A protein has these predicted regions:
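Small/aliphatic-rich secondary-structure junction motif
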Residues: 2-51
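Conserved acidic residues
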Residues: 3, 106, 134
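General small-molecule cofactor/ligand-binding pocket signal
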Residues: 36-38, 83-87, 138
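Short secondary-structure boundary segments
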Residues: 39, 111-113, 141-142
Length: 142
């Protein structure tokens, strides 16, 4: 049923990554799908962190890739050989949708949290992905 699954995670809140990660891993195993794991750094954060780091954005991206790899190992999912992706952009949901298109994802898995007041006014990234994705979206709540 699914051939390419994109898991989008927020490494600023690693505790919220657990359920979406386990859901994506289970689905990838069940369907023999390719798993892509993505984190998006907001453009403002990327610029500020790159200026603070002596080696810039590449060092930050490498650190994030290592953190994703550690999460994958803890979920006992290394056998899936997931494609780890780190991108940056002004719009997190637009980055997720763009990567989903590029990867040919037929399922996007995202986490969701208890909405804050600003989320009621602006909408969460998960809600925007659900609204605009061209493929199925699974929202895993913690």
């Amino acid at each position: 049923m699914y051939k390419n699954i994109l898991l989008a995670i927020d490494l600023n809140d690693e505790a919220s990554c657990r359920k979406p990660l386990l859901s994506a891993v289970e689905l990838a195993r069940t369907f023999g799908a390719r798993l892509h794991v993505l984190t998006v750094v907001r453009e403002v954060e990327a610029i500020l962190e790159a200026k603070a780091a002596p080696f810039g954005y590449d060092l930050i991206a490498a650190d994030l890739e290592n953190r994703i790899a550690a999460l994958i190992r803890r979920a006992d999912a290394s056998d899936l050989k997931p494609n780890i992706l780190v991108t940056h952009g002004a719009s997190i949901y637009a980055e997720i949708l763009g990567v989903a298109e590029e990867a040919g994802a037929d399922l996007v898995v995202v986490g969701s949290h208890r909405p804050a007041m600003k989320d009621y006014l602006l909408g969460t990234n998960a809600a925007r992905v659900v609204r605009h994705a061209r493929c199925s979206v699974l929202v895993a709540r913690e």
